[in-house]
Amino acid sequence: MKVGNTLMAARAREGRTRVLIVDDSAMVRQALALGLSTDPRLEVVGTASGAEAARAQMAALKPDVVTLDLEMPQMDGLTFLRSYMESAPVPTVVISSLTRTSGETAMRAMEAGAVDIISKPSLGAGQGLPAIMRDVCARVWAAARARLAPPDGAAPAPVATGASEDWIHALGASTGGVQALSRILPFFPAQSPGLLVVQHMPEGFTAAFARRLDALCRMRVREAADGDLVLPGLVLIAPGGLRHMEIERAGGVCRVRLVAGAPVSYSRPSVDRMFLSLAAAAGPRVSAALLTGMGRDGAAGLLAIRRAGGRTFAQDEGSSAVFGMPLAARDLRAAEEILTLDDIPARMMLAAAADTRAPSLASND
């Protein structure tokens, strides 16, 4: 089902983005309203403590984007989200406190159409709160511009290939990536080359995401741990929030290293950090794709993989929720092909099976 949010997206591009905050805590509503109001691109047009009040305000105020708490009295956030996504969809950012239960619920919210998920800022974060709120503002602003229409029709059948065991696939994504990855990962065959994923996501939520994908996919899926081997048939998801995921080769095998470091392109884990390490560790035997997301994270790393002789792809604008990261890759000529989301798994598998390699780029000219 295509979702008609063209008018809201156009209005958001033209002026200030209208935000409705839905949370049962008055203190959280006030803190979010104050924080979001510091961004000149955003206008908080209303707040609501529950689903019924939010529904009335959505009808009256026509917000461009909703921030939604999942744990609310009477009607919970997930049930409310599903109800309005069916009848009058609005781009939505889930802002949730992390528990194991809330992590699973957040994944169901993403499947129901939420654009992004943010860990609820701690009101006791002190001096770190302004930086946290800058990230929240940027992601709320980007969410209002996301395309909510999923790809039509069934995704392609898996491609049987004779890919070698030491080949590595890699995917990077941000806004809209949960839905994109949930769609394409199930179509990689069970014994596909090892597959590495960086999805921008808060600390703790990636474990729930990995469990959800493991139930959907032919390959095994789990959250990566330091020292994990990159093996055929296994998808490793970079843990959210605290460290970067890099790959090192030693003794003829590739291993995951979770390393400390400042955010790159405002992101940790960073797609660039993973891609750059892969270019050094396994460059000619890597196929990598940069999927939907805001910003530029991953573009420079994708270019490094292409220059090292690997195969590189990026998601096209029409199938991206936010055409930011793939656009940056296109502008750098980092991707040898720009593909629809549904075409990416087959092209990556065919690249792994092909005897020829993409030409290495000596320059960006």
Swiss-Prot record:
Family matches, as Pfam families: CheB_methylest, Response_reg
Positions carrying 4-aspartylphosphate: 69
Enzyme superclass (EC): hydrolase
GO cellular component assignments: cytoplasm
Record localization: Cytoplasm
The CheB-type methylesterase domain, residue ranges: 162-355
EC number(s) reported in the record: 3.1.1.61, 3.5.1.44
Keywords: Chemotaxis, Cytoplasm, Hydrolase, Phosphoprotein
UniProt xrefs under PANTHER family: PROTEIN-GLUTAMATE METHYLESTERASE/PROTEIN-GLUTAMINE GLUTAMINASE, PROTEIN-GLUTAMATE METHYLESTERASE_PROTEIN-GLUTAMINE GLUTAMINASE
Protein family per UniProt: Belongs to the CheB family.
Protein's UniProt name: Protein-glutamate methylesterase/protein-glutamine glutaminase 2
Native species: Cereibacter sphaeroides (strain ATCC 17023 / DSM 158 / JCM 6121 / CCUG 31486 / LMG 2827 / NBRC 12203 / NCIMB 8253 / ATH 2.4.1.) (Rhodobacter sphaeroides)
Lineage, highest ranks first: Bacteria, Pseudomonadati, Pseudomonadota, Alphaproteobacteria, Rhodobacterales
